[in-house]
């Protein structure tokens, strides 16, 4: 019938709210995956695609400023994987380089310290989430570049 009920228990109201939010996030991730599919997770998809991003966008890049923008994005999309490396005590430069050379769907498994097929292992990201994150970050960067200033909280 397409309907399910998830019952969750918790010792405190705060714990129950936290669990409810986690379930809602998981449900939204499943809906996103159903709508637009999944990508290999762990930051590997964007790292692998960044290598030929300038070639792919060659017909859309009209000047040096736009080319610089693409190069900035090429570097920025590697940051999530670099941060995961740092969190795991691994060398970001080596792993990011190696992930960039891997076949489709492959990435680094931090628990086993080796390259694996991420889709096979269930390490996935909803394509919609990745697309929206990239679009939103480019939009914010564009706004900052064109406004020439920003007020930030440190």
For each feature predicted by the language model, list its residue ranges:
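Extended, low-charge hydrophobic alpha-helical regions
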Residues: 2-154
């Amino acid at each position: 019938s397409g309907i399910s009920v998830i019952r969750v228990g918790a010792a405190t109201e705060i714990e129950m709210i936290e669990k409810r939010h986690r379930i809602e996030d998981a449900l939204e991730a499943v809906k996103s995956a159903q709508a637009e599919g999944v990508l290999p997770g762990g930051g590997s998809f964007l790292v692998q695609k960044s290598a030929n991003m300038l070639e792919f966008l060659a017909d859309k890049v009209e000047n040096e400023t736009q080319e610089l923008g693409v190069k900035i994005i090429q570097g920025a999309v590697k940051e999530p994987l670099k941060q995961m490396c740092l969190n795991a005590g691994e060398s970001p430069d080596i792993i990011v380089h190696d992930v960039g050379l891997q076949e489709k769907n492959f990435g680094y498994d931090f628990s086993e310290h080796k390259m694996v097929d991420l889709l096979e292992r269930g390490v996935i990201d909803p394509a919609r989430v990745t697309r929206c994150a990239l679009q939103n970050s480019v939009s914010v960067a564009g706004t900052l570049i064109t406004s020439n200033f920003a007020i930030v909280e440190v």
